[in-house]
């Protein structure tokens, strides 16, 4: 039994904002919390500020990004290195 491919998910409010900006033909930053939305060809050339849990990170959408999710381009975790702790223990010896 063959399966039908589903359409990519895009939040309705984000799609409406993209269409409105495309009609105006102005470049403005679009703010969104929808990290699960897929990137469509209509979004190419726009700057979208994507929420990472703390703040909005502006990302410029290019052609190779089409088909991927918005959340893939904004990291949510910050890695802290333990190098300074290791250097302190070596100096005490």
UniProtKB/Swiss-Prot annotation:
Transmembrane segments: none annotated. Keywords: Chloroplast, Plastid, Ribonucleoprotein, Ribosomal protein, RNA-binding, rRNA-binding. The keyword Transcription does not apply. Its main location: plastid. Pfam families: Ribosomal_S19. It is found in: Plastid, Chloroplast. GO terms for molecular function: rRNA binding; structural constituent of ribosome. This is Small ribosomal subunit protein uS19c. The gene is rps19-A.
